[in-house]
């Protein structure tokens, strides 16, 4: 067994020395010479010179005419005039939405009934910020999202 471990140790050392030269980092930019980079830069400059600018290809007036024609062809809906801030009588009375007009007495009666219901609710429901319950263990509940303290008066 001693000879086997000696052979394995020497084999591992041999592999370590052989692979040492191959494990160096080879950056990508190291394989490209400066001359090649300059050639690429010159080629890019020549291509940019040959490519016309967008403004030179089509004047802005032609672009705006073309865009209006395309908009008209693409939008099947008629254009809606801008809102002037005036409300017609049907909208003012709530007729446009199918609702009748509410007078102030109806509104105040509704608000009063909601406030009474809120005040009539138990104090624990009004002031605890609970939104659910959670089962910690079988038979043991704890409040989920509830305040950890109680209000005292």
From Swiss-Prot:
What is the residue range of the signal peptide feature?
A: 1-25
Record-given protein name: Natriuretic peptides A
Q: Name one GO molecular function term.
A: hormone activity
Organism field: Equus caballus
Q: Tell me the keywords, alphabetical order.
A: Cell projection, Disulfide bond, Hormone, Phosphoprotein, Secreted, Signal, Vasoactive, Vasodilator
List, in alphabetical order, the GO biological process terms annotated in this UniProt record.
cardiac muscle hypertrophy in response to stress; cGMP biosynthetic process; cGMP-mediated signaling; female pregnancy; negative regulation of systemic arterial blood pressure; neuropeptide signaling pathway; positive regulation of cardiac muscle contraction; positive regulation of heart rate
Q: Where is this region: Disordered?
A: 54-105
Family, per entry: Belongs to the natriuretic peptide family.
